[in-house]
Amino acid sequence: MPNSEEVMAKERVVSPSAEFKKNANISLKNYKSLYKESIENPNKFWAREANRLIWFKKWTKVLSHDFKNAKVEWFKGGKLNVSYNCLDRHISTPLKNKAALIWEGDNPTESRVLTYYDVYREVNRFANILKKFGVKKGDRVLVYLPMIPELAITILACTRIGAIHSVVFGGFSPEALQSRIDDCKPKLVVTADGGFRGGKPIELKKNVDLALEKSKEKVKTVIVVRRTGNESGLTWKDGQDYWYHFLMNDPELSAYCKPEEMDAEDPLFILYTSGSTGKPKGVLHTTGGYLLGANLTFHYVFDIKPEDTYWCTADIGWVTGHSYLVYGPLSNGASSVMFEGVPSYPDAGRFWDVIDKYGVNIFYTAPTAIRALMREGLNHIQKRDLSSLRLLGSVGEPINPEAWEWYFKNIGKGKCPIVDTWWQTETGSIMITALPGAIPQKPGSATLPFFGVQPVLVDNDGKEITDKGEVSGNLCIKGPWPSMMRGVYGDPKRFFETYFSQFKGYYFTGDGARRDKDGYFWITGRVDDVINVSGHRIGSAEVESALVENKSVAEAAVVGFPHDIKGQGIYAYVTVKEGVTTNDVLKKELISTVEKMIGKIARPDVIHWAPGLPKTRSGKIMRRILRKIVSGEFEGLGDTSTLADPSVVQKLIEDKKKFHS
């Protein structure tokens, strides 16, 4: 049964240009050779690659593991420090005065450039402040800041002294913040008086106050960065609240903090998943393996060169911001753009303005942003100079072929490879991806595994699907990789049950995938997003991809609903592009497209014209809510605090009620 991605793939295999291949960090031949070594002789491969990092003490054993019982240990006995690898190692080189962080504020008139030496000095000073407040190795520090340089400085300062940082996205509510405080029990909180997003102020200190009032934990110290300068209505508790700038300007504060020598398996950070499926999980990453994963993938996936300016649009509140805005770039000595704003402010040309302003060479963003900007047309793009770009990236969800083609043609001008990266908070670093000078791309496919990663497809009985040709199944990973999570913080049982119990001997990703005849992987969506229509398994992502092939459609989300005859029917929420009129003609067009690209079995039973879709702030569609609305369960929708725009849900409920009446 063909689907949109397969149809597109048969038409389009996009190979890197001869010029790109000539200058790339790796060739296809070397990729195949190194990948083979990484699977057949992982100890040799990872021992060599670990020398990319600076170790205070070398490891005694590369890898010990009992994967069936979720026990993994990398670089046993090795000692290192993350901030040392991101900063100190560069200070005695010509990189000392190279731009490390290029900060672009929400307001286009605000910007800052911090060199490696600037960041090094700030991190040392703030590390000493943390120590002054009694923070020591193993203590947790909760960070609730906007996208400003102090966010990167804070987490690097934590790594310098061995404290475990837990960054909470600045858009989360006081309730979401409180649940994370209760779970990780921080010694100290770092926040700001407020922030800006899309020209609008966001309250941060106030949210921290509300969270701490309700929290079971008694946090004694809150350090506040002055971002807005608006102190009206700011509650201040002497003895608890301290201004960041006041502390940093203390003339007696030492300018150097000796980096803590950390064991490779010492905890580095806790990052909570979005909470779209019940209680948030505190994903725990450790020091050596995580940093090596972020460092190595950044070098190869983004084909980084010393002169590049690189921009990952993700917030540091998400794992993409951790790995590919801070730790991956800085450990490689790269210049990393950090953006406080949104793509639509002050107008829909903001991304292109930033690329033009800084001469960005490598651009890494999410399909959600790409599709939103597609709706705005080409006018904003044509006014900007994007000629500096040489590589594009996609992250967060599968990119549908139409968005891929638009991105390739209009942003990359047909010359920039696109790395469509599949990975998770839990994996720590990129797992399946094209290497841009080596692996030909297929629009919509994540392509092939990174070094040391063994993705397999298993059936529902846990049997590995080894057939050649086109096959589908549950995406699992066979064997350990350095940057994998080591546990759910404070809940080892949940770690095993969530990731290792369903398919014995494998890490279960929760995603479904298809592997084509060339061995390329196509992510078809979460396994719980599979709709069983008359005994046929239909991936929601497949239907969504077909729907958005229509030039009138901006976005689509598909869920199953109870059907008297078929067991489950297909219900499609469809958002059209600006200026498009919704009518029965368009509805028939969409159904016809799905039938043509997948088959009649996949035709939507209902098309619901949606003004928007309920998404988390990281861009993930909350299908759990959509399923409940379809079923008429308008109450008890669960935690909606992670939604970017809760009003969308109410509108969908009203539409559904009208539809029923």
Curated annotation (Swiss-Prot):
Taxonomic superkingdom: Bacteria
One MF annotation (Gene Ontology) recorded for this entry: metal ion binding
Catalyzed chemical reaction(s): acetate + ATP + CoA = acetyl-CoA + AMP + diphosphate
Enzyme class, first EC level, given as a word: ligase
Cofactors demanded by this protein: Mg(2+)
GO BP terms in the entry: acetyl-CoA biosynthetic process; acetyl-CoA biosynthetic process from acetate
PROSITE patterns (alphabetical): AMP_BINDING (PS00455)
Record's keyword terms, sorted: Acetylation, ATP-binding, Ligase, Magnesium, Metal-binding, Nucleotide-binding
Keyword Protease attached: no
Pfam families: ACAS_N, AMP-binding, AMP-binding_C
Modified residues (N6-acetyllysine): K620
EC assignment: 6.2.1.1
GO cellular component: cytosol
Family matches, as CDD domains: ACS
Annotated residues for binding of Mg(2+): V548, V553
PTM text: Acetylated. Deacetylation by the SIR2-homolog deacetylase activates the enzyme.
Binding site for CoA: R197, G198, G199, K200, T320, S534
Residues involved in ATP binding: G396, E397, P398, D420, T421, W422, W423, Q424, T425, D511, R526, R537
Keyword Ubl conjugation: no
The family this protein is said to belong to: Belongs to the ATP-dependent AMP-binding enzyme family.
Protein role: Catalyzes the conversion of acetate into acetyl-CoA (AcCoA), an essential intermediate at the junction of anabolic and catabolic pathways. AcsA undergoes a two-step reaction. In the first half reaction, AcsA combines acetate with ATP to form acetyl-adenylate (AcAMP) intermediate. In the second half reaction, it can then transfer the acetyl group from AcAMP to the sulfhydryl group of CoA, forming the product AcCoA.
Protein name: Acetyl-coenzyme A synthetase
Source organism of the structure: Leptospira interrogans serogroup Icterohaemorrhagiae serovar Lai (strain 56601)
